[in-house]
Amino acid sequence: MATLIPLGDVSRRTRRFAMVTLLIVVTNVYVFLRELVEGNAFVRRWAVIPAHIEHGRNLITLVSGTFLHAGWLHIAGNMVFLWAFGPAIEDAMGRMRYLIFYLMGGVVAMLAQVAGSPNSHVPCLGASGAIATVMGAFIVMFPRDRIRSLVWILIFIRVTYIPAALLIGVWFLIQLLNVGMVATVQSGGVAYLAHVGGFLFGVVTARLWTPKAAFSY
């Protein structure tokens, strides 16, 4: 079994500290701690229930659901990916545009997941759809950047450098191959539809949010 963990972009230096990305990470951690304290009632109140969205109810959960997570590994993995790709996009777009872009991507991702199971009453949650939006923007803007990555195969661990286009491209292919699965608290599945929807939103709209000079081809 192989695991690949992106650690960050080594091809560029950001002009300023990624304050918004850090704020998003801190908010996710805070909300997760609230989940641990308040339990399942908190999750059901703020997570996306597809059947509710289908009937125009609890639309705020399209945002709040992106800050909920199903466990320690879920939130840890998401925050590592966000910190690997988020700072460069925040630096290129500017803080406010990046924040709006991230939140809108999360909403689009959740809507994609709802579209795949509109009658479900099982909570959908997680930041991965919004993070997929950031990754979509990254592959458009900085495809040649090298991503420092930790590769773990059985007992062998090493750090290597992988072109962003290859790393993100393979990741997206995996999402497409698994797009039939649904992420739920009960099943422990992965929201592949949300990933695909968020990623495509990032790819299509990245140019609209970012000055042309920020792109690196």
Residue ranges and their predicted role:
Residues 1-217:
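A detector for small-residue-rich transmembrane helices and their helix-helix packing motifs
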